[in-house]
């Protein structure tokens, strides 16, 4: 009440925005006579002039009136269409990074060309995002003549596109594509092994068509890239025969002919020299290793991992202690609680090794390698805007989540559609019969076309069956074949047309009263001018007949949970001032009525003693349904907002990893990185044997020497150093060992040569980063699955999630460093041929990725995780918890005085 009173005095925010924008429109219109007088060549030459002015420091806002006037004049000459003033307002809205709500049929596609043209002048690229490939291709081809006349390049991206073609499309001034493809390309770009393989050149400015569908309905849809599950079952089965031929060494330090020694504390195994030789011979006999080839050559490290997993499976993991067999599957037993953990799987190939040991079918892993949500992807753009026919009902969410204001653009002509009250029936059968009867009544009265919107395919089939029984010809759409869908929707305004469509089908294509004569002309082979004149004359007659019959009739077979979806269906009729009628038919059995409409409405209808074919029509009922829809919308918004808090944690970690990956790819040499890794790993390793601030009696020097020998392949006389220099403390020891290890690494590096060493370093760093990031994603999923239970312990699940996620992230960084240092220390110096083979393997690995597109349940905090879960036990060391700072250049919260990227955020 108060809000409407204030709005009446001062005007609403939307009215104030429109008033401001109309002044800019006046400036554009004032330029029209001058711009119209330009020749085609002079008009086209305006684009390089604008680009030069922009490069000289003039802002796009300053260029806007003249650029819009040029774009409008070019559209008039090339496309035969002139932008209305309301379309200019829409273009200003898009340029300012807002959402333009424009009614169906008001020309959103043409409106978008204004903001595209202006923002393309910066040279940073504009992305136009649509809901399907057909619309992307259609809009790109429709606008291509205009943009090419103005000297701008245009590209389209789609799935399974040739890499060179896709790269060229991204280099174009304006790039069209679907939300899925843009999102997948972002993920793929962060899995490449050289900067030259990247396709996207930055996320500068995006215009999202049907923005409500993408940013609200699909907000939590995860884009997932998963590794094609390589069928390694034969490898696990073959290597499973090796462990029974081996025996453990009883003591780590005493060579007694054993093939490996067991570290039960760390649940790891290390092979002895005899073990290496034995395993190599076995692998050669199996044909898995070439004669004379080393197990520790760079290209064979995967075999080392397989053998290690097989030995661990046989000697460290016992049936009915660490796992049980149930229905032919290995189920992990939690060692702390004794409970089984269905759905969880050990990582690093251990689970498959246990399956091979038990003679079970080896389950391939289709692991998530990269994932993001549309919510997080689109928030990466420097400037984001969108257009739709229905966004005002979700304006609060658009503002809070994405920082986007919604501006309602007035219609070019007044809206005269007749939106009638809902009719409510006792049951679905009564409702469907009433719909069929209404269709027959409309057909008897004239030639008005009818569009029936359904919420489900099942409802479409029921109505289609009843229409067939009544002998009424009709079309059915289910939003699967986009091109056919658009064609049928385009003709859905023809006289006597009856079309059944799911509520979302055919979005982006206008329903023209009388049908679309241009689409009919395009289907003819070699059409003549006579054909064109005939079809146009026929359309003019059909158009007039449909107008006289009251325009398009919309019949909704039920209400959706969201008012916005209902408004989309209604918005099919009444385009550009055309007449039209809309009405929803409901029943007490509809989900929304059954769950949300309230007992009062249901009780009232039952008390009236209505029969199946009788309906109630009252504003109170319609209001009650709208109130129910508002409650559902508010609940869904709260769920999305709450889940976004958790997603934001993952998103920050993703940005750090991807940024680090780009830095690695951009560096010519990683020597400085790798040497720093050596120092950090040495510090952590030494701390395991020489605890900080401990006395000499607590030092396990022998254990440290063995660890250096086994993990890094380096013999250091640590005990001798201590005996020679009694003043050598813990800090001095760390420095001396680090210097020795790095000196040895530099020696090996010199033997390889700078170029080969740089390639090997990049190979191991990227491989380790990608492998552990994949495992980290699974661990984060598992953490999230049960985090809500912390609420029962009077803890804040959100804070607990942030704390645990940070610990997991820091631990992952530590494991990556350890892996890189260990692999680089133990790998045999590769030949140029082996390096080339490694590079080829990397490329094969990149090409073996497959895409998987899934919907995530919005209530994902309590739902089961369908992906295989990775063990969280890989890094059990307690870590101090610090919050992740907003910027990687901010001081690290640990208090070290270093930047975060050089401290806890460093790889």
Curated annotation (Swiss-Prot):
Its main location: membrane. Monomer and homodimer. Part of the essential Sec protein translocation apparatus which comprises SecA, SecYEG and auxiliary proteins SecDF-YajC and YidC. Its cofactor is Zn(2+). It comes from Acinetobacter baumannii (strain AYE). May bind 1 zinc ion per subunit. Part of the Sec protein translocase complex. Interacts with the SecYEG preprotein conducting channel. Has a central role in coupling the hydrolysis of ATP to the transfer of proteins into and across the cell membrane, serving both as a receptor for the preprotein-SecB complex and as an ATP-driven molecular motor driving the stepwise translocation of polypeptide chains across the membrane. Belongs to the SecA family. ATP binds at residues 87, 105-109, 510. CDD domains: DEXDc_SecA, SF2_C_secA. Gene3D superfamilies: Helical scaffold and wing domains of SecA, P-loop containing nucleotide triphosphate hydrolases, SecA, preprotein cross-linking domain. It comes from the Bacteria. It is a peripheral membrane protein. It is an enzyme of class 7 (translocase). SUPFAM superfamilies: Helical scaffold and wing domains of SecA, P-loop containing nucleoside triphosphate hydrolases, Pre-protein crosslinking domain of SecA. Keywords: ATP-binding, Cell inner membrane, Cell membrane, Cytoplasm, Membrane, Metal-binding, Nucleotide-binding, Protein transport, Translocase, Translocation, Transport, Zinc. This is Protein translocase subunit SecA. The gene is secA. Its EC number is 7.4.2.8. It catalyses: ATP + H2O + cellular proteinSide 1 = ADP + phosphate + cellular proteinSide 2.
